[in-house]
């Protein structure tokens, strides 16, 4: 795709987003910056941006082939990718297959317990509030998403889990948990966005 890269629109912890000459396409530049502990610890990991770009793009393309719509358009180079412009739904969507970390502490479940069915959790994307966990009733009441959007997000999240579990199993990796973000295209369509 031939587009002109324009001004920076956004800079986050791990990436920068730039406008392009196509109003429906943006360019994402992946950085080497890393944070931990709700942003309290900051550092740099050499080539992290390259790894994140390449891995996320490969997974997005695989998910597209499995029928999950994503924002992926085209990888430009090691750090830069064109993606569909979305309005991010302010929810982190967490899928848990195995009890670990803060979940085990919060729920009193032993680490390593494999769940009979995956758990889907939402957190409200709000740095000032430290991304609190919410349920779908909060999401509806706060106008973060509609019921139809939440249904679509849940359907896609569980399908992503099935695809990623197979990919990871083939690589002898146990998929414990992961976070997803979704966005709205200009026509309101929900698609998988951000990075995996």
Annotate each PLM feature.
Residues 108-148, 196:
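Anionic ligand-binding catalytic core segments
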Residues 74-79, 168-184:
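A short glycine-rich, hydrophobically flanked beta-strand micro-motif that places a catalytic Asp/Glu
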Residues 2-124:
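Active-site loop/lid in soluble adenylation, ligation, and acyl-transfer enzymes
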Residues 144-176:
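A long amphipathic alpha-helix within ATP-dependent nucleotide-binding catalytic cores
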Residues 95, 175-194:
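Conserved metal-phosphate-binding beta-hairpin within the catalytic cores
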Residues 25, 88-90, 172-175, 187-190:
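Coil-to-beta-strand transition motifs
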Residues 40-50, 133-156:
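Short histidine-centered catalytic/ligand-binding loop motif
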Residues 1-2, 76, 159-164:
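Short Pro/Gly-enriched beta-strand edge/turn motifs at strand-loop
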């Amino acid at each position: 795709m031939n587009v002109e890269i324009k001004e920076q629109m956004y800079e986050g912890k791990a990436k920068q987003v730039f406008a392009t000459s196509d109003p429906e396409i943006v360019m994402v530049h992946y950085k080497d910056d890393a944070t931990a502990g709700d942003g309290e610890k900051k550092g740099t990991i050499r080539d992290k941006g390259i790894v994140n770009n390449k891995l996320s793009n490969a997974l997005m393309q695989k998910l597209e082939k499995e029928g999950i719509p994503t924002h992926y358009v085209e990888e430009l180079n090691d750090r830069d990718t064109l993606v569909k412009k979305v309005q991010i739904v302010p929810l982190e969507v967490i899928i848990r297959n195995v009890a670990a970390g803060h979940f085990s502490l919060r729920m009193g479940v032993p680490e390593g317990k494999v769940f009979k069915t995956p758990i889907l959790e939402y957190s409200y994307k709000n740095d000032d509030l430290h991304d609190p966990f919410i349920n779908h009733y909060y999401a509806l009441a706060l106008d973060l998403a509609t019921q139809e959007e939440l249904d679509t997000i849940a359907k896609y999240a569980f399908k992503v889990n099935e695809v990623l579990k197979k990919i990871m199993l083939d690589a002898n990796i146990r998929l414990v948990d992961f976070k997803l973000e979704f966005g709205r295209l200009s026509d309101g369509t929900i698609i998988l966005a951000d990075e995996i």
